[in-house]
Amino acid sequence: MSGKIVNYYDGSLECKGYLSVPKSTHDLPLVLVGHTWKGRSEFEDQKVAALNELGYAALSIDLYGGGVNGQSVEENQALIEPFIKDRQLFRQRLISAVEFGKTIKGVDSSKIALIGFCFGGLAAIELARSGYEISGCVSFHGLLNQSDQPFQKVNTKLLVLHGDKDPMVSSNQILALQDEMTESEADWQFISYGNTYHAFTNPAANDIEMGTVYNHDSDIRSWTAMSNFLEEVFSNVNK
């Protein structure tokens, strides 16, 4: 991979992202990549490379700060807990990453999107919920925990890509999210992949007891759905 580690800040907290901007004669759309509950890792950095192949600049972000990675289920749970409980913290951390992204040389600051996986999928939804406007947000097998913040008018287009057998998401949470997005006047899509568990895009996921299982077909289909969505939202800018 041809990217580099970059430091950016949320207040005084130093965050360590991974950035790659393909060579181009014009400024490129930027796609931010939100990480799983483990923290920013090679998985997200590989998504940066895959997004480069689609013609986009990409930045995998660091929501925890300091490049921290959890080493166990217990550590991962402890890392996400402050963000689940404090959505203002969550939103501010995300907005700081987006604002940094807008300053990157070679990036078209009017064309920004956020995609995320698992905890990062919730991050994509939470940024849309905040009312902060970017071109689009995409959630891959995201957690769907409801926010403690009041509904805002959602100004960002949202695509949610979900595994129908994901044990970490209840049917009530799905309905609540859909109702919330409709009430918030969002432009939203929700795609559910049959016979598909949590973490279906991660080839390393193989724990059926935990409900995290890679699914090749759903991985390919969801990436295609994301690609089509990004092409749409970036082409609609300024129209």
Mark where each language-model region is:
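N-terminal cap/leader regions of alpha/beta-hydrolase-fold enzymes
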Residues: M1-K239
